[in-house]
Amino acid sequence: MSKTIAINAGSSSLKWQLYQMPEEEVLAQGIIERIGLKDSISTVKYDGKKEEQILDIHDHTEAVKILLNDLIHFGIIAAYDEITGVGHRVVAGGELFKESVVVNDKVLEHIEELSVLAPLHNPGAAAGIRAFRDILPDITSVCVFDTSFHTSMAKHTYLYPIPQKYYTDYKVRKYGAHGTSHKYVAQEAAKMLGRPLEELKLITAHIGNGVSITANYHGKSVDTSMGFTPLAGPMMGTRSGDIDPAIIPYLIEQDPELKDAADVVNMLNKKSGLSGVSGISSDMRDIEAGLQEDNPDAVLAYNIFIDRIKKYIGQYFAVLNGADALVFTAGMGENAPLMRQDVIGGLTWFGMDIDPEKNVFGYRGDISTPESKVKVLVISTDEELCIARDVERLKNTK
């Protein structure tokens, strides 16, 4: 038996889950937020308890030290050597990483170089990896890449219709993201449907603060909505999703607050989407509250959100030439029944119909009617478990 930590590190946060492997039992989980800021928050959940501390945590190395000390302090482990592996979620692996890998100096260097593809994510992941390697140098660290699952896309799908030199010289192409989540829920959908994954055509919709839709043909990603970076695709919590690229130079010319392309991209990443259009929040619960109050900006943001998701799902019905099931997952996908209802309401032509009594908050499973030609499933994603499984698989190959 061994204990494995699955890590999802952001620029100012470190989310973690500790597993007993190979039993896949969750022993504890938590998150450290506001790293590098005053009043950092460390939350630990274990044995039905919740412990929260307000601390000053200056960087990821301090965060990792606090995490490990908390595991001992709360009696979750007796010593560091009980931990035999650490798995790290890394958003962008580019073309270099087609599967999960054991970390070494070269791997870490490549992850930092690939930050251009995921500037909001890769730097934090690299900081988390470096911190664990410094503190626990003898423990196997594994990187699990969001992009790996999408490396099965055909060249005509992942290339953009621009001169090919930008791909050959600069590797400009579609990479996708959320691959670990899409892979996991597709596997779970096959179990739920009682059919081999290799026979199924699935559309998986990961709808959280980030949103991505994937066309899954016989267990492989054949197309996905996120692109060169996770900014592409449908409207998201704070991200715009797809826009006409000519808007970028136009805004630089027109708005004195936007001095260069980096300013515009920052606005598209952090100040757009549900938050930017509504002026209220990136949280669907707040948007739905605005709908109840007939707030016109909330209504507009919600309608754009639904419209963009429906279009991608419809597009992937064409890519797959039909589908056996549509899967909703992630924060909104799992917990926003109104959103699911309104998305499906625009897709009934494809043979989808949901049971309103099953399409309620907290329900997991098949929410479609018996007559529905395409099954509609709500499945909780578990990226952390996928990461822990890959650590278990790779830790003896170091």
Swiss-Prot record:
Quote the pathway field: Metabolic intermediate biosynthesis; acetyl-CoA biosynthesis; acetyl-CoA from acetate: step 1/2
This entry's comment on the bound cofactor is: Mg(2+). Can also accept Mn(2+).
- Detail which positions bind substrate: R89
Required co-factor(s) are: Mg(2+); Mn(2+)
- Name its GO BP terms in alphabetical order: acetate metabolic process; acetyl-CoA biosynthetic process
Q: What's the Enzyme Commission number for this chain?
A: 2.7.2.1
> If you read the UniProt record, what top EC class would you report for this enzyme, in one word?
transferase
Instruction: List UniProt keywords, sorted A-Z.
Output: ATP-binding, Cytoplasm, Kinase, Magnesium, Metal-binding, Nucleotide-binding, Transferase
Annotated binding of Mg(2+), by residue: N8, E383
Major localization class? cytoplasm
Q: Where, per UniProt, does this protein localize?
A: Cytoplasm
Which cysteine residues pair off into disulfide bonds? none
Listed InterPro entries: Ac/propionate_kinase, Aliphatic_acid_kin_short-chain, Aliphatic_acid_kinase_CS, ATPase_NBD
One molecular function GO term is: acetate kinase activity
Supply one GO CC term from the record: cytoplasm
A Pfam family (short name) is Acetate_kinase
Site positions (Transition state stabilizer): H178, R239
Catalytic residues (positions):
D146 (proton donor/acceptor)
Identify the NCBIfam families for this entry. ackA
Main function: Catalyzes the formation of acetyl phosphate from acetate and ATP. Can also catalyze the reverse reaction.
Subunit note: Homodimer.
In which family does this protein belong, per the annotation? Belongs to the acetokinase family.
Its name, as the record gives it, is Acetate kinase
Gene of origin?
ackA
